[in-house]
UniProtKB/Swiss-Prot annotation:
Classification via InterPro entries: AB_hydrolase_1, AB_hydrolase_fold, AB_hydrolase_sf, HOPD_hydrolase_BphD, Rhodanese-like_dom
EC number(s) per entry: 3.7.1.8
Gene Ontology MF terms in the entry: 2,6-dioxo-6-phenylhexa-3-enoate hydrolase activity; 2-hydroxy-6-oxonona-2,4-dienedioate hydrolase activity
Family, as annotated: Belongs to the AB hydrolase superfamily. BphD family.
One GO-annotated biological process of the protein: biphenyl catabolic process
UniProt pathway: Xenobiotic degradation; biphenyl degradation; 2-hydroxy-2,4-pentadienoate and benzoate from biphenyl: step 4/4
Residues reported to bind substrate: G42, G43, N51, K111, S180, R190, W266
Quaternary assembly: Homodimer.
The protein's name in its UniProt record: 2-hydroxy-6-oxo-6-phenylhexa-2,4-dienoate hydrolase
Gene Ontology CC, one term: membrane
Presence of the UniProt keyword Hydrolase in the record: yes
């Protein structure tokens, strides 16, 4: 297998869905076999490649077609003000992308805010949903044990409102357990993504005013999700509370939970080898 990189796997598709008319979605596409769509979270500067470049190679080597999709209004995808719950819009964008690419069914890997999109996708399009892998997903309402919004979400909104290198470093400090991993390369790469399209920042805040995060709660519908699901969480997550993982496995008919120690909100990056082994085994045997 030749070495994968961002530029050689990069492409755009144009989708037409409700609220996303003639809308360009950016993705990185590599490999052949069953489709695995990986969807990043909602922090400023987030993108498919930056979130999952430590995972795409092992998944392709294992025989999967891997698609790293940029969410609407993030990274290289077109921008938009969302008038509905973000998870609904995210799910709709996945449906549109799958239609253009000719993919009938896909396994879905989603984290953080995009986790709400995975849950909505599985609810609305169960026949097109393979297995689900969720990492600290949003969209599950309040916590029994933790005041919300948590520290990481507060810093995320601060970075959207006041974009600066200092604010970015503050947010990254609560992304990772091992602070030595916050390198200049990581910071500058994320900062370049933030600066690529300032409209993304403005539109995120406008969208949040129209539909607050507190309105995202698919908990009552969790028992309807029949897909086999692996839920993963960082024990030290400072964005989404760990007890939400228990809520998922208590209410979804076929869900299991794995908690990574010494891990905050980026298991697929901070513990890439362990994450890849766990998730590939789940896809093959779960």
């Amino acid at each position: 297998m030749s070495e994968l990189n961002e530029s050689t796997t990069s492409k755009f598709v144009t989708i037409n869905e409700k609220g996303l008319s003639n809308f360009r979605i950016h993705l990185n596409d590599a490999g052949e076999g069953e489709a695995v769509i990986m969807l990043h979270g909602g922090g400023p500067g987030a993108g498919g490649w930056s979130n999952y470049y430590r995972n795409i190679g092992p998944f392709v080597k294992a025989g999967y077609r891997v698609i790293l999709k940029d969410a609407p209004a993030l990274n290289k995808s077109d921008t938009v003000v969302m008038h509905e719950q973000r998870g609904v819009v995210y799910a709709r964008s996945v449906k549109g992308m799958m239609h253009v690419l000719g993919i009938e069914e896909a396994h879905v890997v989603r984290k953080s805010m995009a986790g709400a999109g995975a849950l909505n996708f599985a609810l609305e399009l169960p026949e097109r949903t393979g297995k689900l892998i969720l990492m600290g997903p949003g969209g599950l309402g309040n916590s029994l044990f933790t005041a919300m919004p948590m520290e990481g979400i507060k810093l995320l909104f601060k970075l959207y409102a006041e974009p600066s290198l200092d604010t970015l470093k503050q947010m990254l400090n609560v992304f990772l357990f091992d602070q030595s991993l916050i390198t200049d390369e990581l910071v500058q790469g994320r900062w370049a993504n933030i600066q690529r399209n300032p409209e993304h920042l403005k539109n995120f805040l406008l969208s949040a005013q129209k539909v607050p995060l507190s309105a995202w709660d698919v908990s009552p519908r969790l028992p309807e999700i029949k897909a086999k699901t692996l839920v993963t969480w960082g024990r030290d997550d400072r964005f989404v509370p760990l007890d939400h993982g228990l809520k998922l496995v208590a209410n979804m008919p076929d869900a299991q939970l794995h908690v990574f120690p010494r891990c905050v909100h980026w298991a697929q990056w901070e513990h890439a080898d362990a994450f890849n082994r766990l998730t590939l085994d789940f896809l093959a045997n779960g």
